[in-house]
């Protein structure tokens, strides 16, 4: 919260993002070495927003890091409510303000969805979300198998 309060988000991100990205690459390589058909999933709120490794030659470095990108969307009020419910140590007003600061630093769902390979709307029941995730999981596994078959 200090980084948001003092306007030092970029400084914090410039320290954290390269380390996280390097660890993701190491982890993905480890998984691929064990099973070429494996589907690995990375959860990240700032896939598109991170400035690490973006350049004039490669303005979309996430495309070299991920085979597929899935964006999960939800209405802003629903996301705010969920955030307030799970954040510890803040009263409701402070948690809502913290959500608003974080949300302002992220691209809109619409902007992210336009760049995604798949979009899951998380605006219904948990059961519905699980069904959508399971369906997508099967698609991703099938795509992995098809790519492996093409490589042979």
Please give the residue ranges for each predicted region.
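Small-molecule kinase domains that catalyze NTP-dependent phosphoryl transfer to phosphate-bearing small molecules
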Residues: 23-27, 53-63, 88-146, 151-152
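N-terminal phosphate/diphosphate-binding loop that engages ATP/GTP or pyrophosphate donors
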Residues: 1-11, 15, 19
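Residue-level signature of catalytic and energy-coupling elements of molecular machines
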Residues: 12, 41, 120
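Short beta->alpha linker loops
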Residues: 15-16, 74-75, 103-104, 124
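Short coil/turn helix-boundary motifs
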Residues: 5, 31-35, 123
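Short alpha-helical
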Residues: 7, 18-19, 77-78, 107, ...
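ATP-dependent NMP and nucleoside kinases share a basic, alpha-helical "lid"
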Residues: 22-34, 40-85
